[in-house]
Amino acid sequence: LSALLNTSILLRSGVTVTWAHHALMENNFDQCLQGLLFTVLLGLYFSFLQGLEYMEASFTIADSIYGSTFFLATGFHGLHVLIGTIFLMICILRHLSATFSQHHFGFEAAAWYWH
């Protein structure tokens, strides 16, 4: 169930970051901010749930090849999500300081990284 929920969260975050990107291209800065905020919240929620999943796991990284593979793969993906969340938080700060243009490369790079 947890894997399905995490997948759903990440798919929704892809929708919200795309919403933010399209809003930015249309100079709709309020919707861009909303999309960014939703995406960051979903990224943080995903990270929280992944941490819970690690704490509740009945195996460790040292138990077997399955444990090693599981923690390595999900750990790298979790790190990717955390870095992407930080990128998007920086975009929110830049957005609030009114330094965004319709095609702000920093935002576009963060959105590419997120996908």
UniProtKB/Swiss-Prot annotation:
The gene is COIII. It comes from Artemia salina. Component of the cytochrome c oxidase (complex IV, CIV), a multisubunit enzyme composed of a catalytic core of 3 subunits and several supernumerary subunits. The complex exists as a monomer or a dimer and forms supercomplexes (SCs) in the inner mitochondrial membrane with ubiquinol-cytochrome c oxidoreductase (cytochrome b-c1 complex, complex III, CIII). This is Cytochrome c oxidase subunit 3. It is an enzyme of class 7 (translocase). Its main location: mitochondrion. Keywords: Membrane, Mitochondrion, Mitochondrion inner membrane, Translocase, Transmembrane, Transmembrane helix. PROSITE patterns: COX3. Component of the cytochrome c oxidase, the last enzyme in the mitochondrial electron transport chain which drives oxidative phosphorylation. The respiratory chain contains 3 multisubunit complexes succinate dehydrogenase (complex II, CII), ubiquinol-cytochrome c oxidoreductase (cytochrome b-c1 complex, complex III, CIII) and cytochrome c oxidase (complex IV, CIV), that cooperate to transfer electrons derived from NADH and succinate to molecular oxygen, creating an electrochemical gradient over the inner membrane that drives transmembrane transport and the ATP synthase.
